Curated annotation (Swiss-Prot):
It is found in: Endoplasmic reticulum membrane. GO terms for cellular component: endoplasmic reticulum membrane. Residues 12-26, 142-152 have a biased composition (Polar residues). It comes from the Eukaryota. This is Reticulon-like protein B17. Residues 168-355 form the Reticulon domain. The chain crosses the membrane at residues 177-197, 202-222, 286-306, 349-369. It comes from Arabidopsis thaliana. Keywords: Endoplasmic reticulum, Membrane, Transmembrane, Transmembrane helix. Residues 126-138 have a biased composition (Basic residues). Residues 1-110, 126-152, 382-422 are annotated as: Disordered. It is a multi-pass membrane protein. Residues 382-415 have a biased composition (Acidic residues).
Amino acid sequence: MESTPPYHRSNTKSASRLQDSSNPPNLSLDLVLSSPNTPNPSSPVPLRDILLLPPSPLRKSRTRLSDRLEMTSEDAMAVVRKRGKGKGGQKSLLASPRNPRRSRRRSEAVEEKEANLVIEEIVKLPPRKRKTNGRPKKDKQSSAPPLCSSSDLPNTCQSDLNLIGEIISDLVMWRDVAKSTLWFGFGCLSFLSSCFAKGVNFSVFSAVSNLGLVLLCGSFLSNTLCQRKNEDTKRAFHVSEDDVLRSARRVLPATNFFISKTSELFSGEPSMTLKVTPFLLLGAEYGHLITLWRLSAFGFFLSFTIPKLYSCYTHQISQKVERVKTRIGEAWGVCSHKKILAGSAVTAFWNLTSIRTRIFAVFIILVIFRYRRQNLQLTPEEVEPVENEQEEETLPQEEETVPQEEETVPQEEEQTQPSEERALVVVVAET
């Protein structure tokens, strides 16, 4: 037998091998079909819809309750579908080359479950209120500037007036010598310089006009020198309610003080009427000679001199006034022609004065009569407190009254002496 050469043998083997390798296995990354014994997962939803998962519900807005409920329902359906697929195709997933992708999807499913649980807890909780960046109303009310109530306003006004009164009294009474000397010297210098100045005529209209010219020149120069680049921001000056209230609070104490003093002066009391009437009569009679500048000058000098002198020499002045009163009373008591003197004085005044002066003289006489009547007659309401006070006095106070009684004895002796002199005068007149 002839044996075949080796190269022929190799050719036949290569041909068979080529035939076997003509149909190579189609390897692909697709899923390996499961065995026919394993049942396919029955799901009416296609695979595309399952893979196209909805976005994470945490990214959606949580403002509306209806949107939250819809998201939770959709997530629950997706989780159920994935669970069914996992039960049926677990073996295929193990045999599939896409295990990393499936594990990734499983982790996403676990995250979605946790998100669903969080959403359910959020739905169960009550809706939260919106937080405002601003402070609460109580803090805002507390931070606002407190306004003076109507009840605290009189107290503040009274405190301001008391403070002003203390400052003026300290200056006038020379308690602080340095300040009083400074103000007195400055006032004297200004008034004396104005007295020696000649040809100076002050007018309110001219002063306002000059001030307006100065302001106009200043505004023009500032506008020309300080020009801005096409941006002229003009400040709009306007008066607001706060400005009006602030100015009213400043002016209110002085206004209330003026009203109270005016009502006190014109109250109609006899004592106050006798004090105010002479000044008003002098002002009405010689008002044309009094100017504002002279009045301020006299008021300045008198305010810095008279109060201090009166406080230093009060006792001496009161003693001299009492002596003058006693002498006048003694002379009037000794006079035997009282009616003649009174009648002559009344007729002279009536003939030498005008009708206006007569009317005011009658008015002053009526006020004097009422004042005397008010001082002499005591009402029962005033007598009862005096009696109660006398009963409540202690023994030391009674001891203090003993020297006072000893002092009244010489006064009674002085009163008896004019009566004896009157008797002697009457006897001499009869003789």
